Amino acid sequence: MKAIIVRPPNEGVEVKDITLRESTDGKIVVRTRLSGLCGTDRGLVTGRLTFARPPPGYDFLILGHETLGEVVKGNGEFSPGDLVVPVVRRGCGSCLNCMLGRQDFCETGRFTEIGIRGAHGTMREEFLEDPKYLVRVPRELGDEGVLLEPLSNVVKALTEMEYLQRRSWWRCDDSTYSCRTAVVLGSGPIGLLFSMALRSMGFRVIVANRRPPSQVESEITRDIGATFLNTSEHEDLEPDLIVDTSGHPSAVVPLLPRIRKNGAVILFGTTGLERYELTAEEITMLVENNILIFGSVNASKADFQAGVNLLVEWKARYPGVLQRMITKRVSVEEAPQVLKEKVPGEIKTVIDWTARES
C-alpha cells in the first residue's frame, strides 16, 4: 500500500509502496480518508524534531497523527462505514497515569505517538488499530472530523485551566466567563480552535497576530464573535487569560505586565528558535498578581470525545466555519511538496486519500 514516510533523523519525505509486519489480533481495519498536516509533520520532514524515531525493526516512520478514517472491518463496537479518529499517544504501561488512561501525563517519557515517536502513523491507505484508541465521529460532521485531533489538545488545555483557576472565584457574578477577556496569540488552526472553544465558554476573545488577518481569518473570527487584532498596531490589551499558540517568547512576554490579577497564561506553541529575557520586575509582577502559567501538550481519549461534541455544536452554531478552516486539499502524490513548505494563506491543509477514487 502507499504510505508517506520519513527516515528520522534525516531530512526528507517520500511516497512509497510498503508492506508492514503487523499483528491483526483484536485490531480494526480503517481506511484513511483525510490526513491533516501540522507543524509537527513539517518538523519531522525537516529533521528538526530530534525526538522522532521509527518503530523497532524499521528504518522509516510513516507520518500522520491527524486523521479521519472509515472502518472497513469492525468488531462489536465499530461497524463498517463508521467514521473514526485515532488517539495519538500510547502509554508507557508502567506509570500510574498511563495505566489509568492519562498517557498525556506520562511520567516516564517512554510513551509512543503514532506518526511521531516509535509508532507508525496513518498517512497510508489503510491502518490497523486497537479499538480502545478509536473515537467515533458522527457522519454528519463529514470531513470536518479531521479537526478533532488538534481540537482534543485545546479541550485538554482549557479543562486544565478551569481546574487550576478554582484556586479563586474567577467566574463572573452571573456564574459565566462573560466578563473575562481571553487573548489568543496566533491565528493558525490551533489558535482558531482555542478561540471557538473560549467563545463557547463565554469569554470575550481577541485573536492576536503581528500582521493583518487574511480574508479567511477575518471571516472566521467575525463569524464566531471574536475580534482580530494586529498587535504591531495595538498595545492596550488587558487580558484575563493569554493563550499562546505561537511559541514565540517575544509575543508572550511583553503581554505579561498587562494581564489582570489572578489571570492565567496557557503555553501551547513551541518553536525552539527564539530566546527572550524575562526580567526580575516581570517575575515580581507575576508573583504579586497571582498569575498562573502552565504548559499543556497532547490529550486523553475523554478530551477527544468532548471535542466531538464541540464540533457538532460549532457546525450548527457557526455554519461554514469549520469547512473554511480546511483551506487546501492535496492528493497523496502532491503531499511531499506541502509537507516541505507551508501553503500561502494556509489554516489547515489536508491530504485526500479518496481523491484517486473519484
Swiss-Prot record:
Residues the entry annotates as binding Zn(2+) 2: C92, C95, C98, C106
What does this protein's record comment on cofactor binding? Binds 2 Zn(2+) ions per subunit. One of the zinc atoms is essential for catalytic activity while the other has a structural function.
Query: What EC number(s) does this enzyme carry?
Result: 1.1.1.47
Name the InterPro entries for this protein. Answer: ADH-like_N, Glc_1-DH_arc, Glu_dehyd_C, GroES-like_sf, NAD(P)-bd_dom_sf, Zn_alcohol_dh
Name any cofactors this protein relies on.
Answer: Zn(2+)
- Kindly list the GO molecular function terms attached to this UniProt entry: D-glucose binding; glucose 1-dehydrogenase (NAD+) activity; glucose 1-dehydrogenase (NADP+) activity; NAD+ binding; NADP+ binding; zinc ion binding
Entry binding sites for substrate: T40, E113, E149, N153, N298
Residue spans making up a coiled coil are: none
Q: Which residues bind NADP(+)?
A: S187, G188, P189, I190, N209, R210, R211, F268, G269, T270, S296, V297, N298, K342
Q: What class of enzyme is it?
A: oxidoreductase
- Alphabetical keyword list: Carbohydrate metabolism, Metal-binding, NAD, NADP, Nucleotide-binding, Oxidoreductase, Zinc
- Which reaction is recorded as catalysed by this protein? D-glucose + NAD(+) = D-glucono-1,5-lactone + NADH + H(+); D-glucose + NADP(+) = D-glucono-1,5-lactone + NADPH + H(+)
- The keyword Zinc is assigned to this record: yes
Q: What domain of life?
A: Archaea
Q: Which residues bind Zn(2+) 1?
A: C38, H65, E66, E149
Q: Name one GO biological process term.
A: protein tetramerization
**Family that this chain belongs to:** Belongs to the zinc-containing alcohol dehydrogenase family. Glucose 1-dehydrogenase subfamily.
Q: What the protein does?
A: Catalyzes the NAD(P)(+)-dependent oxidation of D-glucose to D-gluconate via gluconolactone. Can utilize both NAD(+) and NADP(+) as electron acceptor. Is involved in the degradation of glucose through a non-phosphorylative variant of the Entner-Doudoroff pathway.
State what protein this is by name: Glucose 1-dehydrogenase
> What is the species listed in this Swiss-Prot or TrEMBL entry?
Metallosphaera sedula (strain ATCC 51363 / DSM 5348 / JCM 9185 / NBRC 15509 / TH2)
